[in-house]
């Protein structure tokens, strides 16, 4: 399933929300950093279950919950406006669900940056068998 997320990013090309989210992550953490989060822990990548493994994985759990609250458009495909100002992500003048999606992505990218010291390479490409605990509620 997590491979589907990688394929989705590649298929979207230079447009679409997942690409924008990837650009936010790279903007906060450095070029190509997004690859560190595509399949990490129990929640970073496609789907998610169990208990987040660390603060980095919890960023993904919270992001999944945030997307789950968005109504009126597809969070993985909708295109919103944002920019970087002095290293900070600033969501543009988006309305409704576009504003909500941008905020979900902004908060997650900042969360990755704030918790980069918790990143554990042992949680990359973690087997789903290590995420079988009962999932937390959002």
From Swiss-Prot:
Named cofactor requirement(s): Ca(2+)
Disulfide bridge partners, by residue number: 42-131, 44-60, 59-111, 65-138, 66-104, 73-97, 91-102
Keyword Disulfide bond: yes
One Gene Ontology cellular component annotation held by this UniProt entry: extracellular region
Sites where the protein binds Ca(2+): 43, 45, 47, 64
Biological processes, Gene Ontology terms: arachidonate secretion; lipid catabolic process; negative regulation of T cell proliferation; phospholipid metabolic process
EC identifiers of the protein: 3.1.1.4
Keywords assigned by UniProt, alphabetized: Calcium, Disulfide bond, Hydrolase, Lipid degradation, Lipid metabolism, Metal-binding, Neurotoxin, Postsynaptic neurotoxin, Presynaptic neurotoxin, Secreted, Signal, Toxin
Signal peptide coordinates: 1-16
GO MF entry, a single one: calcium ion binding
Cofactor note: Binds 1 Ca(2+) ion.
Function: Heterodimer: postsynaptic neurotoxin. Monomer: snake venom phospholipase A2 (PLA2) that shows postsynaptic neurotoxicity. PLA2 catalyzes the calcium-dependent hydrolysis of the 2-acyl groups in 3-sn-phosphoglycerides.
Subunit structure, as described in the record: Heterodimer of a weakly toxic basic protein having phospholipase A2 activity (B chain (AC Q8JFG1)) and a non-toxic acidic protein functioning as its inhibitor (A chain).
Name of the molecule in the record: Basic phospholipase A2 vaspin B chain
Record organism: Vipera aspis aspis
High-level lineage: Eukaryota, Metazoa, Chordata, Craniata, Vertebrata
């Amino acid at each position: 399933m997590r491979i589907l997320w990688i394929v989705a990013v590649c298929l979207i090309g230079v447009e679409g929300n997942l690409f924008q989210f990837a650009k936010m992550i790279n903007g906060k953490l450095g070029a190509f950093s997004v690859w560190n989060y595509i399949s990490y822990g129990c929640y970073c990548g496609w789907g998610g279950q169990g208990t987040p493994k660390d603060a980095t994985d919890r960023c993904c759990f919270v992001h999944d919950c945030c997307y789950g609250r968005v109504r009126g458009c597809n969070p993985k495909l909708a295109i919103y406006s944002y920019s970087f100002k002095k290293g900070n992500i600033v969501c543009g003048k988006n309305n409704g669900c576009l504003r909500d999606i941008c905020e979900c992505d902004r908060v997650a990218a900042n969360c990755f940056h704030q918790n980069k010291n918790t990143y554990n390479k042992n949680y990359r490409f973690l087997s789903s068998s290590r995420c079988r605990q009962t999932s937390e509620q959002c």
